[in-house]
Amino acid sequence: MSDTPNYITPAGWRSLKDELYQLVNKERPEIVQIVNWAASNGDRSENGDYLYGKRRMREIDRRIRFLTKRLEAAQVVDPETREATDQIFFGATVTLLRRNGSEQTVKIVGIDEIDTAQNKISWISPLARCLIKAREGDEVSLNTPEGREDIEILEVAYVRID
């Protein structure tokens, strides 16, 4: 793991906990049962159920270790408890005016919560990094592959992020 803090919203933390619970209490026991059944069928070298089951169990164990480490390092930050401010920090929901004239709303969340379909961007992404500490009404510059883009910040809110 890196030295970068693992900031996460309460919803993101619950999501990781739910996934860990699912893996530990449902998926892994099912795979163990399949592997035990397949092992009892004799020759394991050509036993597809056994080989697949062992591979899947390793994948699950790897994911369990990853989730456990991420949750242990997590620093839960609730955007709803932040005092009203027009300055952008982790957990902010920001409405922007892009160069092409379109408005876009993004939510600045933790690394484990990224979801572009819901406009959730990581707090260490290039866009979020140029927004952090800026205020409503400010204009920030984002370096993109197409060149520099000036972005106007229209609104900053700290609301619940699901």
Give residue spans per PLM region.
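Conserved, well-folded catalytic cores of nucleic-acid-processing
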Residues: 23-26, 34, 38-41, 63, ...
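Non-DNA-binding regulatory cores of transcription-related proteins
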Residues: 77-157
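Internal alpha/beta loop-helix hairpins
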Residues: 48-82, 86
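N-terminal cationic and glycine-rich segments that engage phosphates or anionic surfaces
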Residues: 2-21, 25-59, 162
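A general secondary-structure boundary signal
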Residues: 16, 31, 35, 61, ...
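Aromatic side chains
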Residues: 7, 50-52, 66, 90, ...
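Residue-level signal for pocket-adjacent positions within structured domains
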Residues: 3, 18, 45, 71-72, ...
